[in-house]
């Protein structure tokens, strides 16, 4: 019998960024109570030796499962120390992997009532519409003109600590091009 392998997309992530994300998730689950219904599975509750933690986020009858890994093969850079994140959308027996942008967008659509395309219809029907969104990571594009006008009028309040973003968790902070000053004034160029 031949080996049967299953391939998963695992986003390389910084160890400290994973620790920060886990502590934000736990804070909002147990202290601020903004993450109701979420389930956190510790590494010792998993049978897989590489799983560091799992966070299950319910989305109606489906759920988003964010799994963090440790002890993976290191990447081509020195700082890729074998830490990673996989993001799955599960509904009954079906599961598929999603990217961090889509994961944040799904969380935003399910949990946060903010000013969006449907807000004008809600306002006409007499429902209360709030132009402030607590989870800005769920917006992956520039909003309509009405949204921009309302956000210019109302200053958003900062939430401390911020709600955990999946995109921020998987963001590669080392491979961003470094901005350096050019030799003429304050013009910036991409450094190497």
UniProtKB/Swiss-Prot annotation:
Stretches for region Interaction with host APOBEC3F and APOBEC3G: 54-72
Pfam families referenced in this protein's UniProt entry, alphabetically: Vif (PF00559)
Claim: RNA-binding is one of the keywords in the record: yes
Modified residues annotated as Phosphoserine in this record: 165
Span of the annotated motif BC-box-like motif: 144-153
Family: Belongs to the primate lentivirus group Vif protein family.
Domain notes: The BC-like-box motif mediates the interaction with elongin BC complex. The HCCH motif (H-x(5)-C-x(18)-C-x(5)-H) mediates the interaction with CUL5.
Name of protein: Virion infectivity factor
Source lineage: Viruses, Riboviria, Pararnavirae, Artverviricota, Revtraviricetes
